Amino acid sequence: FIAFIHFGPNTFTRMEWGNGMEDPRIFDLKNLDTDQWCAAMKEAGMTKVILTAKHHDGFVLWQSRYTQHGIMSSGFQDGKGDIMKELSASCQKYGLKLGIYLSPADLYQIESPEGLYGNLSKYTKRTIPKEVPGRPFANKTTFEFELDDYNEYFMSQLFELLTEYGPIDEVWFDGAHPK
């Protein structure tokens, strides 16, 4: 018995899907109490919660190094909020497992005229995570892959989530192609 939380700009637009061009300020979250969420889940007998950390619109619910399309550009806690961090702490406090839903589709990152994600760059050897000046990782593990620009971005976001938010019990990949 698990909880699945789909929470993002669509919470405020009342649309089923976003298009990746929503103004992040539309995410007008005033209060967040993940302890209340987890206490209610625990009382209901749930053992795990999966959070949609990023849906197809590309809006992220954590302080990612790799995009500005997320809570860092919203008014939530003056752009300093981190829903993943708060939920992870609450899950640990209440003994719940935490899973993440991370969409490989990202409508905010469409750059090619064919409507594909990214810029159709060539596959080259890349190190994951991609370094970002001033934002080092505590975890010094790196991986090398043959990737294009978009997949370097996606894999670096996945690395953030798997190394900075405590135990992650499940990763749910889902996707949709714009064509």
Task: For every predicted segment, state its role.
Residues 1-179:
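Mature catalytic domains of secreted/periplasmic carbohydrate-active enzymes
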